[in-house]
């Protein structure tokens, strides 16, 4: 079942995480987010000072991004600083190498293990990907597996590679409760009339 344009907009983290993003581009992202009626903006921690007083928009940022190879202490410090700077939500990237070292090398088992670890750690959401890996971003198989694993106890954020209305709808149908998008306008403009 397809959800409406407005319902989809309320699921979007309007995202700008490019390493070359400028303050002017972040300000434009915020203005566009307000215009589109999305749930939140997601920016790099260094851009958080530009996000003061965005209510009703929420502010998300990243931690350990994009590789996840930071130490736990570094991630904790980064998360604390981001929270102090006003982040409502933090997307923390796990260390895939550590996950693989203790588990079989099967991707499905790694995804399930990561979802369970996130739940045990008290996370509110699990996220498919950063969108920065050469292998691509979210896919419906991973979203469905994650949604089945967390079974409504956590949200599922599909992120990376979602560029059109139909793909966004497929992610929601697969179980995504949030969408991390840099192409929000194009996707919402692709909604059926």
Language-model features and meaning:
Residues 159:
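Short hydrophobic "strand-cap" motifs at the C-terminus of beta-strands
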Residues 2-36, 40-41, 46-156, 164-186, ...:
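Alpha/beta enzyme core
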């Amino acid at each position: 079942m397809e959800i409406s344009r407005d319902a989809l907009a309320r699921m979007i983290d309007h995202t700008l995480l490019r390493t070359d993003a400028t303050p002017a581009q972040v300000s434009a992202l915020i203005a566009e987010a307000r215009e589109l009626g999305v749930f939140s903006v997601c920016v790099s921690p260094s851009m958080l000072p530009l996000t003061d007083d965005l209510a009703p928009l929420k502010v998300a940022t990243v931690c350990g991004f994009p590789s996840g190879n930071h130490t736990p202490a570094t991630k904790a410090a980064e998360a604390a600083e981001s929270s102090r700077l006003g982040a409502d939500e933090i997307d923390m990237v796990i260390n895939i190498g550590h996950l693989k070292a203790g588990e079989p090398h099967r991707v499905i088992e790694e995804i399930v293990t990561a979802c369970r670890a996130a739940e045990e750690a008290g996370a509110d959401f699990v996220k498919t990907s950063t969108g920065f890996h050469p292998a691509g971003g979210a896919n419906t198989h991973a979203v469905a597996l994650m949604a089945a694993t967390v079974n409504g106890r956590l949200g599922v954020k599909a992120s990376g590679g979602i560029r059109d209305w139909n793909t966004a709808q497929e992610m929601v149908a697969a179980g995504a409760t949030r969408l991390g998008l840099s192409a929000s306008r194009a996707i919402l403009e692709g909604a059926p009339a």
